[in-house]
Amino acid sequence: MKKIPISREEVKCIIKQKIILYGPIFINKSNNFQHVKDFEDLVRTVVTMCNGDEQERLREMEDWIVKNEGTWVLAEGFNSFLGNVLHKADWPSDARVAMLRLLAYGAEQDDIVLILHMDRKDHLVMNYAQQFDRLPIREQESLAMLVGIIL
């Protein structure tokens, strides 16, 4: 099944509708991110599944998240890595939760624009968000946190 790219506004609308249908998800916007822990969780969960290029993306993410160098350190290949984390069924849900929380942290820091810009062609985040009601609860919560901050 081919995913159809949709606009950011349509994704917001879909998520709002599904939150209304399935009950509220409470979003903590108190700047209480545990971004280093989330990054460590992501690494621990996926490092053995990553090829050399993907491990390089993890090193770049370390510069972004842990060393606070900004998203400009992420290479173009980050989008492919993001797609693997969000869309590969054999990758664990914990990896998606950690990645979404890291993206939410980036959004809170006004540092997500570059990532969204890289995603303008493939719409990986928006296509993932379209399946909101079919996601595990922890993924729904993390995605709602990301969208809530972007809104």
Task: State where each predicted segment sits.
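Alpha-helical solenoid scaffolds in large eukaryotic transport, assembly, and signaling factors
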Residues: S7-L151
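Fungal intrinsically disordered, low-complexity polar regions
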Residues: K3-I4
